[in-house]
């Protein structure tokens, strides 16, 4: 049976309205490694399948092992402006020109993907860890500087969670040399909503990196505070046990801050 003949379950949709914001989460199956169209896509195909669209729009010689091409988290203001997180836009922020991390297993990793048709089309250096500095795709919202920060200590106070979801975008075990993954989580409480988009990278014996984009909007507000941070450290300098640096939700607190950006998203007419 060809991939185009496989019947996948329909995507799962969740939607929650919180004040002037609507939060939508879409979760679907992992993208296949071959064309999913009944008749193979070509350059003239106006609406190609996910894989062929990725090949058209990305310049990466390979893709992560697990790509959730249809998954999405979108937060939309009633005016129509939105910020969204999806796999394609996250991968567009991966460095496609140079290998930013040199490790002993890099060549073996590339050789393991030598049979990939996509890899044969474009052979060049690139960031094989798929590290991304993606901060979300903003459409119809105004981005401005902000001195207001997200109170993480306040968010630790127990509160009823009225809506929650977790959406994976991509993941790869780097040929058993570590882990790279992109996931976005959102939770809504009576006091506001909080979302975290996280890229976690671990290259065994080399480095741990966590790039976070946090979003917070208090109840009744027509704006979102967006904080983006990058943290990383060589594993040799992390005086913590492996179970911690292998846990993205724990290790980020042990990593030194490399860079940080804070801004505010709001409707363009405000």
Could you tell me what each predicted segment is?
Residues 1-15, 20, 250, 257-270:
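Classical N-terminal secretory signal peptides
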């Amino acid at each position: 049976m060809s991939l185009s003949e496989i019947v996948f379950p329909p995507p799962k949709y969740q939607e929650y309205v919180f004040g002037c914001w609507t939060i939508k989460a879409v979760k679907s199956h992992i993208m296949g490694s071959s064309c999913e169209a009944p008749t193979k896509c070509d350059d003239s195909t106006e609406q190609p399948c996910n894989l062929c669209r990725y090949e058209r729009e990305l310049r990466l010689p390979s893709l992560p092992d697990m790509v959730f091409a249809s998954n999405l988290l979108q937060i939309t203001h009633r005016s129509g402006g939105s910020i969204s997180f999806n796999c394609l836009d996250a991968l567009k922020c991966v460095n496609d020109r140079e290998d930013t991390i040199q490790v002993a297993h890099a060549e073996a990793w590339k050789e393991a993907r030598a049979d990939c048709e996509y890899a044969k089309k474009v052979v060049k250096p690139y960031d094989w860890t798929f590290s991304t500095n993606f901060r979300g795709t903003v459409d119809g919202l105004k981005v401005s500087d902000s001195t207001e920060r997200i109170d993480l200590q306040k968010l630790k106070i127990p509160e009823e969670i009225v809506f929650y979801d977790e959406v994976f975008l991509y993941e790869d075990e780097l040929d058993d040399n570590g882990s790279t993954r992109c996931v976005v989580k959102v939770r809504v409480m009576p006091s506001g909503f909080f979302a975290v988009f996280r890229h976690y990278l671990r290259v065994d014996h080399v480095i741990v990196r966590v790039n976070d984009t946090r979003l917070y909007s208090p109840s009744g507000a027509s704006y979102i505070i967006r904080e983006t941070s990058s943290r990383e450290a060589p594993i040799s300098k992390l005086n913590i046990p492996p179970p911690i640096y292998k846990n993205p939700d724990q290790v980020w607190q042990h990593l030194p801050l490399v860079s940080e950006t804070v801004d505010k998203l709001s409707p363009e007419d405000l």
